[in-house]
Amino acid sequence: MDPFLEFRVGNISLNEFYRRTIQSEFERILEDPLSNMKNYRFSKQSNYSTKEKTPLSIGVNCLDIDDTGQVLLGGGDDGSLSIWGLDESLHRNDEGEQELINKRLNYIKRQPHQSDDEPAQIMGYKNKRTRINDNNTMRLVHSFQTQRNKYRMYRQSSAAVPVQRSHISNKTDSPIGFSETLSETDSEASISHHKYGITTLKWYKADNGMFFTGSNDKTVKIWDTNRFEAVQDINLGYKINQIDNNVVDDSSLLVVASEDYYPRLIDLRTMNSGVTALGMGNQTRMQSEILCCKFNPVREQIIACGDMEGGVKLWDLRMRNRLYSELKRNKNRFKTINNDDNDDQSDVYFSSNQSKAHLRCCSDIVWNSEGSELCSVGMDGKLNVWRPFTEILQPEGLASYSQLGTQDLSRIKYKKRVSRRLLWFDKFLLCITDNGEVEIYNTEEKKLWNKLEYPMVNQVKKNQASHCQFSSMIVQTNIMNSVGLKLFFGTNNNTVSDGGSIFECS
């Protein structure tokens, strides 16, 4: 029966009707994604032009959409940042019809001739007004609430160009209970941009007036969205691979995966108290670079991390500096790497009956929306779905798991080409490969459902096409302006597309 009719007669709830509608939209997009695909470049020009575009020769390393579904954030491999308003502007297409398009609201990058002590150049629009420089002005950069009090954190700053957006939050209506000037590791001018490529970024869950970025310059930056400038610089001393923010509305926790052997935890409420390193100083064997980290969407105290050796570890913040569990698998349930069916042949990749989650490095992990299952992908060519919280565990404490699709050693060729490879939406799981495609799996049927290949406008040489890769992706789940659900893919810097692009599937 049609979901709308079921909702009208009272067979399903409003939430179930919304979930089925979103799933139907997602299936519609994935059945023929190339038919309704739009291409947006990270253009230096503010206005939209279908005929003349000045491409920015950079790759789009990471994308994220805020909880309102109206603002898209993109990070480039040269340290640049772009912010887009989705369905922000009207444009007349080739048929003469008006259609909604995405509009770049702001852009910032470090210029090639710019020294580290100079502020980054912010490229805005003509209708924006520059605020007067007032060093005595304090502005809100973060707010949070406890059971008894409300707090706001302020910072003294200089002039910047504001982003005129009505749906970008600027929470200033709560009573002042506490104010603290955030400390910085460098001078104010030196934190206004990233020196090297941005590897990861994340919106603040509770308020889109703030977002976070991590870079190869070994820093995590906290940004003010309205002014589009960095207000806090946290130097960790290691290249940043991935960051994540807790999904709880009033959460102030950030987890950071870096080249260090220990995941780092940052509490925005106690910035001056330092950064917590999980597992440091105890008996936990931590001898591998952390590549990925994710908060559990339901059990907010659980953090999952994947490392270079193929291990996947779970941390419980309620257990002080202790490992909650490590996901392992039994060698008897897996064939050797050459798929030999001879039981007498031992698997040289296992030294005991137990093994890490992957034979080689774990490139990315992702939770399902219920927080009950965790999917991991590794360079051993396997996609594993784990159920770490099942009451009945496997013998010797091994977590319950299953494999999605078949083993493909060519799926992941590079350890750190992409910061985020996995996206889990409803029953579908998307995986960015190193073969110029996105694999789409049905997690209920445990098999490959569809593939999205890199769109080629013209016939190109095979050696050129091999360099065209997807590098990031995000899904807009909020249905805005009656357009429906959307998928966004960022691409690398390649000669075929004259630089990185953002592809929109709707």
Swiss-Prot record:
Protein keywords: DNA damage, DNA repair, Nucleus, Repeat, WD repeat
Gene Ontology CC: one annotated term: nucleus
Positions annotated as WD repeat: 55-94, 193-233, 285-325, 357-396, 404-451
Pfam families, sorted: WD40 (PF00400)
Keyword Transmembrane helix recorded: no
Principal location: nucleus
Function: Involved in transcription-coupled repair nucleotide excision repair (NER) of UV-induced DNA lesions.
PROSITE patterns cross-referenced by the UniProt entry: WD_REPEATS_2, WD_REPEATS_REGION
GO annotation, biological process: DNA repair; proteasome-mediated ubiquitin-dependent protein catabolic process; protein polyubiquitination; transcription-coupled nucleotide-excision repair
Protein location: Nucleus
Name used for this protein in its record: Radiation-sensitive protein 28
